[in-house]
Regions:
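N-terminal type II signal-anchor transmembrane helix
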Residues: 3-43
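Substrate-recognition/specificity elements adjacent to catalytic centers across diverse enzyme folds
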Residues: 26-216, 220
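Positively charged, low-complexity/disordered segments
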Residues: 221-224, 228
Length: 228
């Protein structure tokens, strides 16, 4: 009986030790995924030194001697603070969320692919002037520098949330930045569903004169100048 109890205690003790080791490893990886705002690092892609100063609210203030380095620093800071949001939003606009979240994301993926935002964003890059293109390229270079740093220094996954999902840190491109701006515009256009419903209703009306009933603007008889 004593031996049985000793065996049970050993199993329980071993399980506790193993659990503590696993928790310590997880904690270490999560801790490595949190950006270090106090460090000094050397990264490819900049001409002169950049300084990113964080205030008490961790808001970045970027100091650089030229515009390209400034946009580089902005991309780097965004990748430090918003990596999870940036990666998920890029998958959203590409219509690829179901690759990570499964079939429940199919409707949103289908909607995004119908809008074809990402292809339009790639075309939008070509339509930009040289100054804007350089800014987009420098911003993307800053993000990619952070990706390189994460992989080179084994900084976990770059964001704690990415430990839960196997999302690869693919290189960031100028089209990605434009695509996210277009996605934000779509999210801000919540009235589009009402516009579609109104258009379908107008098409279905048997009497064209009933259009006035659904118009957002009340159309009245023109006013003569002498009546103003």
């Amino acid at each position: 009986m004593v031996r049985v109890l000793q065996l049970i205690f050993r199993i329980i003790g071993g399980s506790l030790v193993l659990s503590l080791i696993v928790l310590a490893i997880i904690f270490y990886i999560v801790l490595r995924s949190i950006p270090d705002y106090e460090k000094t690092t050397e990264l490819p892609g900049i001409v002169e030194p950049i300084e990113i100063v964080r205030d008490t609210a961790n808001v970045p203030h970027i100091y650089a001697n030229n515009d390209n380095d400034l946009y580089f620093g902005l991309g780097y800071a965004h990748a430090q603070d918003r990596l999870w949001q940036m990666v998920v939003n890029r998958l959203t606009v590409q219509g690829r969320l179901s690759e990570i979240f499964g079939k429940q994301a199919f409707p949103l993926d289908d909607f995004m692919r119908r809008l074809d935002i990402y292809s339009l964003s790639q075309k939008s890059v070509d339509a930009q002037d040289n100054i804007t293109k350089k800014a987009l390229e420098a911003y993307a270079a800053g993000i990619n520098a952070r990706f390189l740093e994460i992989n080179r220094m084994s900084l976990g996954r770059g964001a704690p949330e990415l430990l839960l999902y196997n999302i690869p840190l693919a290189a960031w491109h100028p089209a990605d930045s434009i695509a996210l701006l277009k996605l934000f515009a779509v999210n801000s256009s919540s009235h589009y569903a009402k516009e579609i419903l109104r258009s379908r209703t107008l098409i279905a009306l048997p009497d064209p004169k009933r259009v006035i009933d659904l118009s957002l603007i009340h159309i009245s008889e023109p006013t003569r100048p002498d009546e103003i």
